[in-house]
């Protein structure tokens, strides 16, 4: 659905931002692009609907090479919707209704179809009833949802969201991810960038790691988060579950890195057998208990014991 071939880009002031990126995303896939600040994630996204034109290389969307003619750009912007990092860059109308209607109106659709799309899109993001509110008076999470609705109203096949959960409380962030998972179930290809490792492991089927404008790795979240050295190089941290198991592994336990809390507990219980809590204490012995406390820190160690006791 998306293919980048040897894509390179430098900003007009000479700052190199992307160097020889090759990337393929299949139709309906959920992918995350991760990497430290300045790695080139936003620059890459701006190439996906022709806002930026590559200095070298090609952008291929749905089998067609973007050729940057006016007609082609209109077509591509219908197909690929981008939700910017800051919703204030996207929302500019006096009311939510007008903002969401802006795209479909520009497509020249009849009024009743525009109305239908506005209602449907606001419903999908849980913002029905906000039609007459002023976008600039909404909360950060609400603005984000209206910005997503504005893109949905264009009925895109690909949605690209630059850091969709940044600055949102955990519950609101989870709500945004649930919306994106639902869109993906409807067949939309969804690509996000994020620094939030918990969100990435919850959302993505495949992860691309960018660093200094280069693609340095790609794989499933598990493949990426198993590679502690890569994570360090990309200035990220491991998800909490992977971090815990990784530390146990370093302490000499035979565990594998898992990403979900459920899988982590299974891994721990598998390690410990039934009656986990008592066996843990017995199994650790004094020396290993000390090593474990040292590695995990006292607080985490007691949290682990407590969690196992609850099982
Ligand atoms: N308009 C611009 N003019 C000049 N340089 C720019 C411009 N926008 C971005 N850059 C530079 O291009 C590089 C890539 O920036 P980009 O915003 O794509 O990174 P990012 O991975 O999205 O970062 P972040 O996680 O901080 O959002 C950086 O070195 C940045 O300073």
UniProtKB/Swiss-Prot annotation:
<keyword id="KW-1003">Cell membrane</keyword>
<dbReference type="InterPro" id="IPR003593">
    <property type="entry name" value="AAA+_ATPase"/>
</dbReference>
<dbReference type="InterPro" id="IPR027417">
    <property type="entry name" value="P-loop_NTPase"/>
</dbReference>
<feature type="domain" description="ABC transporter">
    <location>
        <begin position="2"/>
        <end position="237"/>
    </location>
</feature>
<comment type="similarity">
    <text>Belongs to the ABC transporter superfamily. Energy-coupling factor EcfA family.</text>
</comment>
<comment type="function">
    <text>ATP-binding (A) component of a common energy-coupling factor (ECF) ABC-transporter complex. Unlike classic ABC transporters this ECF transporter provides the energy necessary to transport a number of different substrates.</text>
</comment>
<dbReference type="InterPro" id="IPR015856">
    <property type="entry name" value="ABC_transpr_CbiO/EcfA_su"/>
</dbReference>
<keyword id="KW-0547">Nucleotide-binding</keyword>
<keyword id="KW-0813">Transport</keyword>
<keyword id="KW-0472">Membrane</keyword>
<feature type="binding site">
    <location>
        <begin position="35"/>
        <end position="42"/>
    </location>
    <ligand>
        <name>ATP</name>
    </ligand>
</feature>
<dbReference type="GO" id="GO:0016887">
    <property type="term" value="F:ATP hydrolysis activity"/>
</dbReference>
<dbReference type="GO" id="GO:0005524">
    <property type="term" value="F:ATP binding"/>
</dbReference>
<dbReference type="InterPro" id="IPR017871">
    <property type="entry name" value="ABC_transporter-like_CS"/>
</dbReference>
<dbReference type="GO" id="GO:0043190">
    <property type="term" value="C:ATP-binding cassette (ABC) transporter complex"/>
</dbReference>
<keyword id="KW-0067">ATP-binding</keyword>
<dbReference type="Pfam" id="PF00005">
    <property type="entry name" value="ABC_tran"/>
</dbReference>
<dbReference type="InterPro" id="IPR005876">
    <property type="entry name" value="Co_trans_ATP-bd"/>
</dbReference>
<dbReference type="InterPro" id="IPR003439">
    <property type="entry name" value="ABC_transporter-like_ATP-bd"/>
</dbReference>
<dbReference type="InterPro" id="IPR050095">
    <property type="entry name" value="ECF_ABC_transporter_ATP-bd"/>
</dbReference>
<comment type="subunit">
    <text>Forms a stable energy-coupling factor (ECF) transporter complex composed of 2 membrane-embedded substrate-binding proteins (S component), 2 ATP-binding proteins (A component) and 2 transmembrane proteins (T component).</text>
</comment>
<dbReference type="GO" id="GO:0042626">
    <property type="term" value="F:ATPase-coupled transmembrane transporter activity"/>
</dbReference>
<protein>
    <recommendedName>
        <fullName>Energy-coupling factor transporter ATP-binding protein EcfA</fullName>
        <ecNumber>7.-.-.-</ecNumber>
    </recommendedName>
</protein>
<keyword id="KW-1278">Translocase</keyword>
<dbReference type="GO" id="GO:0006824">
    <property type="term" value="P:cobalt ion transport"/>
</dbReference>
């Amino acid at each position: 659905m998306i293919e980048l071939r040897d894509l390179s880009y430098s900003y007009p002031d000479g700052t190199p931002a992307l160097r020889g990126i090759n990337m393929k995303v299949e139709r309906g896939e959920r992918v995350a692009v991760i990497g430290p600040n300045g790695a080139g994630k936003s620059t890459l996204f701006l190439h996906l609907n022709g806002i930026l034109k590559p200095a070298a290389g090609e952008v291929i969307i749905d089998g067609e090479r973007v050729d940057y003619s006016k007609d082609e750009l209109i077509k591509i912007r219908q197909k690929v919707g981008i939700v910017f990092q800051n919703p204030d860059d996207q929302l500019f109308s006096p009311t939510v209704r007008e903002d969401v209607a802006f795209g479909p109106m520009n497509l020249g659709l009849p009024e009743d179809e525009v109305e239908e799309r506005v209602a449907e899109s606001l419903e999908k993001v849980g913002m029905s009833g906000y039609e007459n509110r002023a976008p600039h008076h909404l909360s950060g999470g609400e603005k984000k949802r209206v910005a997503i609705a504005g893109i949905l109203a264009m009925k895109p096949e690909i949605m690209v969201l630059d850091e969709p959960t940044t600055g949102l409380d955990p519950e609101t962030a989870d709500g945004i991810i649930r919306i994106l998972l639902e869109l993906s179930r409807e067949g939309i290809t969804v690509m996000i960038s994020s620094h939030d490792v918990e969100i990435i492991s919850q959302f993505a089927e495949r992860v691309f790691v960018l660093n200094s404008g280069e693609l340095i790795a790609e794989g499933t979240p598990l493949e990426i988060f198993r590679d502690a050295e890569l994570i360090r190089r990309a200035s990220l941290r491991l998800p909490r579950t992977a971090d815990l198991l990784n530390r146990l592994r370093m302490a000499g336990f035979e565990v594998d890195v898992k990403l979900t809390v459920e899988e982590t507990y299974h891994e721990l219980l598998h390690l410990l057998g039934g009656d986990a809590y008592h066996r843990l204490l017995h199994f650790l012995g004094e020396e290993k208990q000390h090593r474990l406390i040292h590695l995990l820190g006292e607080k985490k160690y007691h949290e682990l014991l407590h969690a196992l006791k609850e099982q």
